[in-house]
């Protein structure tokens, strides 16, 4: 069993269509599984965001909202490969303008919350620190790499 004194260490593969997470566990790196909103166990979180009314939702919630016709953006990671993207860049979703940095931060916050509450390692208390290594998009320019790190 993992030592609870040290923070949980995760590797996050922020993929174009799905995001996969692995946990560091005594030299092993098992993939974290999740239960989606249809009660299926999957080894990923969908890399999607959507507007549910005026609220931005991510992952499984965004997938459901998109099925219901909500404005959504799949593969939003691709925005980071545009050389003109900076920390002040925005994206359009429906009639809303959203900061790319806010979208990325919101998605990764959703990932952390889902790891804590709805995953194969969901016993992680909210007070326990998570340390994550997030993969930087391969075809991103320097500014976009820094945006991901931010």
Where are these regions (language model features)?
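Gly/Thr-rich phosphate-binding beta-strand-loop-beta motif of the actin/hexokinase/Hsp70
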Residues: 2-31
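Phosphate-binding loop and its immediate beta->loop->alpha context
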Residues: 27-150
């Amino acid at each position: 069993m993992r030592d609870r004194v040290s923070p949980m260490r995760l590797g996050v593969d922020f993929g174009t269509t799905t995001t996969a997470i692995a946990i560091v566990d005594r030299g092993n790196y098992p993939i974290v599984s999740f239960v989606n909103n249809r009660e299926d166990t999957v080894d990923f979180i969908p890399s999607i965001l959507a507007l549910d009314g005026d609220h931005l939702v991510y992952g499984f919630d965004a997938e459901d909202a998109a099925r219901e016709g909500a404005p959504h953006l799949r593969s939003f990671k691709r925005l980071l490969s545009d050389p003109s993207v900076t920390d002040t860049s925005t994206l359009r979703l429906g009639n809303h303008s959203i900061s790319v940095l806010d979208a990325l931060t919101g998605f990764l916050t959703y990932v952390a919350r889902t790891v804590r509450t709805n995953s194969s390692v969901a016993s992680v208390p909210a007070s326990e620190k998570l340390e994550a290594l997030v993969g930087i998009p391969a075809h991103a320019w320097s500014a976009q790499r820094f945006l991901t790190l931010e």
